[in-house]
Amino acid sequence: MSDRTTVMYYYDGTYNGFLSCVFESFAEKETPAAILPVDEADQTCLFGAKYIETDLRRAERVRVSIPKKMGMEAQDLLERAFFTCMPEKELRMLEFMRLGYKVGRGVCRRLTEPAVDKITKAVQFLEREAHLYLGFLRFAEYGDVLIAQIEPKNSVLPVIAPHFINRFSGEDFMIFDRTHKLALLYKDGATEFLQAEHIELPPESPEEEKFRAMWRTFYDTVGIEGRRNDLCRRTHMPKRYWNRMTEMRDKV
């Protein structure tokens, strides 16, 4: 494959779209200067750029080749990497795949390779953030629906969704990622992800503020003033999460 060219790839922002870009790169024996979702594209740079249509057949060929050539660990790593906020993540993933096709199943252990190191660290950050949201996400009751809003750096919603679906399988709920404009809807046992610029919240249930007040009282009561350590709290409960947490909202 040739060195990086000046051509830029634009795609629809989906994982299948990215895999279609990978197919195009190998088919044309070119390494693009950038791979960007079309909604992030600078319109002044579109001249001379390629818009890569999502081709499910081509995407599936690439998808099947990953575990076959690199192993399931590499497939899982790439799928998680797509949810990260890593700069130029598509190019870093393409670099990883080029290396993986070359060296095979040991690619994930080659941590001295920049492509592997960057993706591994990005996925670790994604997983740490997702883990924090398992404890920090707070629902509020709006009518018969539970609604929570999050503002993550990474696109953690697809990662944390199975946990909350399992935990609240008997409820109807929605989690809205304000950063990535993505909503998870769970109703009557069915799950759906929707892109949404914003959401119009229905009126809160009459009892909601009472529950919030009780939770804040409980949180403040169980704390031991003599053992208070604000630095330790900020370490384990980073301040950027507080504005969405019932017990911390008035402390922001």
Language-model segments: residues:
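Internal, well-folded beta-alpha domain core
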Residues: 105-195
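Short, hydrophobic/amphipathic alpha-helical patches that form generic packing surfaces
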Residues: 17-28, 94-102, 162-166, 212-220
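Charged, alpha-helical interface segments at or near domain boundaries
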Residues: 36-131
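N-terminal ordered "arm"
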Residues: 2-56
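Long, compositionally biased intrinsically disordered terminal regions
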Residues: 172, 183-188, 199, 203-252
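Short coil/turn segments at secondary-structure boundaries
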Residues: 76-81, 178-179, 227-234
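Acidic, Ser/Thr-rich peripheral helices and adjacent loops at domain boundaries
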Residues: 50-58, 190-203
